[in-house]
Amino acid sequence: MNVVVLFSLVATHADIDLETVARLSAGSAAVSTSTVVLATCNRFEIYSAAENPATARAEMEAALAHATGFAPSLVSSSFKLLTGTDVAKHLFAVASGLDSAVVGEREIAGQVRRALIDAQTAFPVPGPLVRLFQTASRTAKDVGSQTALGSQGRSIVSVALDLAGDSSATAWDQRKAVVFGTGAYAGVTMALLRERGVSDLSVYSSSGRAADFVASRGGTAAESLEEALGSADLVIGCSGSDQRVSAETLADIRRRTGTAGEPLSVIDLALSRDFDPAITELPGVELLTLETVRLAAPSEQESALLQTQVIVSRAAADFELSIATRSVDTAIVALRKHTMAVLDAEMERVRAQHGCTAAAEEVEFALRRMVKQLLHGPTVRARELAAAGQQAEYIAALQSLYGIELESPTPAAQPVESIPAVEPASCPVNHNAVDRSQSA
């Protein structure tokens, strides 16, 4: 049996610059099907299942290199390969907020959940990947209910708004805010701005989706870039579009609208950046980026972090055991079928020689009990080896000793406990009136 292995390719702000993460993310459509892609403001991760992870990785990286224009060596060096328990442990930590720029943020759990939904909408997702992401979501819920991590509701957006508020003397209810983008982060940003008292709120979308976005969320749709930036004193970039606002464009708009030199806070949360970093050279303009937020994010309590790490580690270990158990279940079922087939063939010979008698029925009953006892040891041992990560050795032994060729288990395969035992073959003779003690 060829064993399917879970693996992930991880590129995050912790290892490479956000510009590279953004360009890799832009090429995600080139990645083969049957994968789940997690792309956020500071990470691009690919989760997949393959019999040969090295080959699958090479194919994905080649596709990304072609789509992004990056050199293959740069694409390869940008990713960290995770296999085994590390895959689950990493994803569960991400979903729980442990690996975020703002530790404990809650938005990431929703992004993990949506990543699976988006993948399932596009194509069939392998069972192991579905279970991986579903378990990640459950782990995030456990962290939320059992620890104080993220209890203060901090997120990248909230910390960024805190920084913008600290640097401005204008009260929140007097600010004029514009949100760039119409995605999930834009929706979260609008909600947080309203919580702080901002009522003069506009949305700008270079793709023209602002009107539909504000129709269900409130606010005003800015029809042009000049309208969006002309009177605002707070701008939050969440779009990640290809149309980056340059320093020259912003300076020109501020000059034409008579706002040059006036205070303007720009929060750029887009992975591919909505604003050129050079805007900080303009008078009165302050730029806050994801890196700014990461450095300023308050630390969580040590006890909450430790509790979360324990929950994540246990969940990852349990998940890995469940994967190993599923793979060895197929071998256990195959061994039972093989043994029962031998028994049935032998009983056919007994009946052919001695007829369908009470004695033959007694022999069959005794043999089936013996086979059940003989299989108990190998079944228990299979579970023990699976728990130790040695299920491959067990499967190889069955193939060598009995010549049993196993097929890869399907995602919907029944666990061993739910597979009914093989019933003894029925005998057409009614032996109810026969005294079994006389047939020995």
Swiss-Prot record:
Binding-site residues for substrate, renumbered to this chain: 40-43, 100, 105-107, 111
GO biological process per UniProt: protoporphyrinogen IX biosynthetic process from glutamate
Active site location: 41
Pathway terms, separated by semicolons: Porphyrin-containing compound metabolism; protoporphyrin-IX biosynthesis; 5-aminolevulinate from L-glutamyl-tRNA(Glu): step 1/2
Catalytic activities: (S)-4-amino-5-oxopentanoate + tRNA(Glu) + NADP(+) = L-glutamyl-tRNA(Glu) + NADPH + H(+)
Residues annotated for NADP(+) binding in this entry: 181-186
Keywords (A to Z) from UniProt: NADP, Oxidoreductase, Porphyrin biosynthesis
GO molecular function: glutamyl-tRNA reductase activity; NADP binding
Keyword Metal-binding among UniProt keywords: no
EC number: 1.2.1.70
Site, as annotated: Important for activity: 90
Keyword Transcription appears in the UniProt entry: no
NCBIfam families: PRK00045.3-4
Domain notes: Possesses an unusual extended V-shaped dimeric structure with each monomer consisting of three distinct domains arranged along a curved 'spinal' alpha-helix. The N-terminal catalytic domain specifically recognizes the glutamate moiety of the substrate. The second domain is the NADPH-binding domain, and the third C-terminal domain is responsible for dimerization.
Other information: During catalysis, the active site Cys acts as a nucleophile attacking the alpha-carbonyl group of tRNA-bound glutamate with the formation of a thioester intermediate between enzyme and glutamate, and the concomitant release of tRNA(Glu). The thioester intermediate is finally reduced by direct hydride transfer from NADPH, to form the product GSA.
Family stated for the protein in its record: Belongs to the glutamyl-tRNA reductase family.
Complex formation: Homodimer.
Function: Catalyzes the NADPH-dependent reduction of glutamyl-tRNA(Glu) to glutamate 1-semialdehyde (GSA).
PANTHER family reported for this sequence: GLUTAMYL-TRNA REDUCTASE (PTHR43013:SF1)
Annotated protein name in UniProt: Glutamyl-tRNA reductase
Organism from which the protein derives: Renibacterium salmoninarum (strain ATCC 33209 / DSM 20767 / JCM 11484 / NBRC 15589 / NCIMB 2235)
Source taxonomy: Bacteria, Bacillati, Actinomycetota, Actinomycetes, Micrococcales
Gene behind the chain: hemA
